[in-house]
Amino acid sequence: MIKEELIMKAKAVRLHGANDLRLEEFELPEITDDEILVKVVSDSICMSTYKCAILGTEHKRVHEDVAEHPAIMGHEFAGDIVKVGKNHQHQFKAGMKFTLQPALNYKGTMWSPGYSYEFFGGDTTYCIIPAEVMELGCLLEYKGKAYYEASLAEPMSCSIGAFNAAYHTQMVPTFSLAISL
């Protein structure tokens, strides 16, 4: 019996270098036993994404060979799990909604989705979540109704952290900000 391999295509905004973003369709490799294939439903855009697009390899999270292995942009995203590698089937199932914690800091590296990975980022139709995300506990089941709320969790935590830091360092804010969901 011949095993039929599914060819998975994705369309994504990918970084090829400084000021070089391209909307491209490409094939995703088959996932390994330690990876998870997801469909992205919602992705937020961050100021650090803009800085990454302008700086290219000068950005601390962008790998040096991005021209040969373009990185999928976007790190604040949520969606649906499509396929689960056998080593994670005890915890994750196809059809489950997800969000993630993008600040991985895996083994001291600065790599994170949206800057560093060829097949892992939020500005895409589908992506492959690598093993280190599950190893770090950064892939999270999402039980909310609206995907956009999950993709806004990281920016909201940054805003709350900034106000908390300002309070504890006695910085005097010179502006007002209202956040509502």
Regions flagged by a language model, labelled:
Residues M1-I7:
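Short, Lys/Arg-enriched N-terminal segments with co-localized hydrophobic residues
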Residues K9-K11:
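Extreme N-terminal starter segment of soluble prokaryotic enzymes
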Residues V13-L21:
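Extracellular beta-rich ligand/substrate-recognition surface
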Residues P29-D43, E58-L104, F120-G121, L140:
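Glycine-rich beta-strand-centered segment in the early N-terminal region that forms part
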Residues K51-H59:
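Short Gly/aromatic-enriched secondary-structure transition segments
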